[in-house]
Amino acid sequence: MDKTWLKQYPAGVPANIDVAQYPSLVALLEESFKKYAGRMAYKFMGKSISFAQIDDASRALAAWLQTQGLEKGDRVAIMMPNVPQYPVAVAAILRAGYVVVNVNPLYTPRELEHQLKDSGAKLIIMVENFATTLQQVLAAVPTKKIILTALGEIGRAHV
């Protein structure tokens, strides 16, 4: 198979990765947060967010998640579009020892119910804009803990 996309890679970017380089995804994140702490990770709504800020926010969220009675390997759903809270939530869930369940924020109530039942997610982190969809299925799903966040905020949420 001709891998035409490799021609687009910048010089020095390998065609393959060494999957044994990191023992876990958390180890990869930890190294990246440390290595790029002073760098901007992204800009959102005119605000720059550094790798250090993502690191700090995800550590705080991971610590809080571990107080919620979940067990290692439990599923935690994330229902967000491409917003700064998403990488914070992913890093926090992984750091806490849980499994990330991505949920399309455009799901209908029927689709959301199916995914939450199928995954067994016990907690969901979501942008408040989509809370009405969850509200319609909450009685039928195993997900009983909800963290709401708003567009443009990072580092605080409503539980």
Tell me the role of every PLM-derived stretch.
Residues 2-4, 19-40:
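A short N-terminal helical cap/helix-turn-helix that marks the beginning
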Residues 67-68, 95-158:
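Structural core segment of the AMP-binding/adenylate-forming
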Residues 20-21, 38-83, 87-91, 108-113:
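Conserved AMP-binding/adenylate-forming core of the ANL superfamily
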Residues 14-23, 154:
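Flexible, low-complexity linker/hinge segments
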